Structures are given as C-alpha cells and as structure tokens.
Amino acid sequence: MNHPSNPPNSLTAYQSVELPSKAPLLTRTGWSFFMLALIAVCAVAPLLNLWLPQSSPYHMSTYAVALLGKIMCYAICALAMDLIWGYTGILSLGHGLFFAIGGYVMGMYLMRQIGLDGNYKSTLPDFMVFLDWKVLPWHWTFSDSFIATLLLIVLVPGLVAFVFGYFAFRSRIKGVYFSIITQALTFAAMLLFFRNETGFGGNNGFTDFKRILDLPIATPNMRMTLFVLTGLTLLGFFLFARWLVQSKFGRVLQAIRDAETRVMFSGYNPLGYKLTIWVISAVMCGVAGALYVPQVGIINPGEMSPANSIEIAIWAAVGGRASLIGPIVGAFIVNGAKSWLTVAYPEFWLYFLGMLFIAVTLFLPNGVVGLVKKWRAAK
C-alpha cells in the first residue's frame, strides 16, 4: 500500500488550501448522550430480558432482538459508507460485496460447525454431499478454525478492496465512473457466487446453522450475546471513526473531497489516503456481515445484489453525510420503515424507498441530521 506522504511544510507553502476545521457536529453533551444511548441498548436490553418475564411489556421478543441486531449491522455499513462518501467524496455502489464477503467467511465456519448433524450425516456440508463432492475445496481449508475465521473476516474484504482500489485510484477513476465500476464488481461477484462449482452453496447459499463455538446458536442467551456484541462493535467503530475524522488524516480526506487537485499541489498523495480509507470502510462492512449472518441464519448471493449496495448509500444520505451520527440514524429509520412496510404493504416498499431518496436529495441534502442542525440554529 502506498502510505500517505506527510511533508511538514507543504500546506504552509500553499495558503490557498485550507483543511476543514475540527469543529464538532454536536456539543460534548450531544456526543455523550449518543454514546450513552448506544451503551444502554447494548447493556440494559439484555439485563431486562434476564430479569423480566416474557409477559412483561419491557421484555424484548426474539424477533425484536434479531431485528435490532440486524439493523445495527446495517448501521456499521452506513458508517463505513459515510467515511468513504461523506468524508472523502467517493460514492461506492459496491459496499454490499464486502458485507457479503464477511458474511460468507462466517457462514463457512458455521457450516463446518454443523458437523455430523447435517441431513447427510457427513463431515462435508450438505450441499457438497448433494453435489457428490468428496473433499473440501481449497478455500475451505481454515474454515473450521474460529481464530482463522476472525482473521479472514478482516483480511479477505480488505484484500479485495485493496486490489480493486489500487488499480481504480491509480487510474484516477472518479465520480460516476467509479460508482459504476463498483456496482459492476458486486454484480459480477453475485453471478460468480450463484454458480455451484465455486463451493459457496449456489443460489441457496449457507443456512441451517446449529452451533457457534460449539454452543447452540438459536438459544435466547446466544442471540442476546450476539446482539450485545454487535452493539459494542458499532460503538467501537463509531468512536474509531470519530477519532479518525478529527485527526490530521481525516482533515486531509475532507480536503481531498473538496479540492483534490489543490491537495496534490500541496505535496500530499491522494492515492494513499483514498486507498487507506477505502480498505478501512471495506473491512468495517466485512465485520458487519460476519455479525449479521449468525443472527439472521442465512447468507446467499442475494446479499451481493447491487440494490443492497444502493440501499447502503441511501441510509447515509437520509441520515446525513459527513456527520457520523447521521448514517446510523438513517440506517435505523430506513430499515425500521422497511420492516413494517414489507409486512403491511410489501408492494409499496420500493416505491417508498425511491420517493424517500428523491425527497432527501431535493429537500434535505444534508439529511435528517442537517435538518436538526438547521432547526437548532434557528432557535
């Protein structure tokens, strides 16, 4: 990777380039309240479920735990999108690929955990027995190790992002052209994973998981553990992203977003900065996918659909780009609405999503968070 160069006096030599200020979006009280709210969701909810009977109105149902856990995974993806789009100005329509890669890596481990409890009583996953395979493919070599799985969840999305990003950024592909090729990448990967011979379960993908770390995966305690782990991961990534965007590295990213050519004239190397944040955002999505799969119980090539990547961008736009909190809020708003509309009025969901994106683009260019800021400034 090309490491960002950091000449000591380059910015002083070109006074026309001014890095964005470090003024925070929210006051210290606002940040504290947001972080406390996340901690409360992660800590109070499981405690209430332990102490309160299921008949209590404050007891979270299994459905609610799974839904909130899933939305928190989506919120991590939205936060990753904010780093690459909101703060660096690079619109990716392929982040669903990195989410799915992380999910598939975790899914491979969970399939190996089934062991002899599968329908065919074989050490091979059921779909391999059905296809009359005799041995595991080479890319399943480390899938029975949890430690190796954790490493691959980070390394595989990061490596794919690095290779793709290096050639794309080196070729100076920008704007809508970059968005198009990222969408083409995830579409090509989806078609590849649909093929049975690739060893990823074909169109059915992976499902029917039974254990994780040799513990039953469907018990209420395990579901709550995964829920808490997801919330803590979201909180950790949020704090990391906040530190990153307020650092000198983050201010250079914002300068690249606003005036990349002038940043180059100042002696900085945009390639290294863009590639670094691109890989970081891809790894975040991979981790989100790995947390998502054991909670929903399935992963298939449909997760790589270009529509899913577009939705990630919509979450960031609805909440408000370059705000950190905004994309998280947007993920909760959009997916909360989706969980209701797809049940009550399933035929209207795509129309609603399209109208929501158009409305935000025309009337709320800074998203919900921007509207709140404007309202507060007017008081």
Kindly label every feature range from the protein language model.
Residues N2-K379:
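Transmembrane alpha-helices and adjacent helix-loop boundaries
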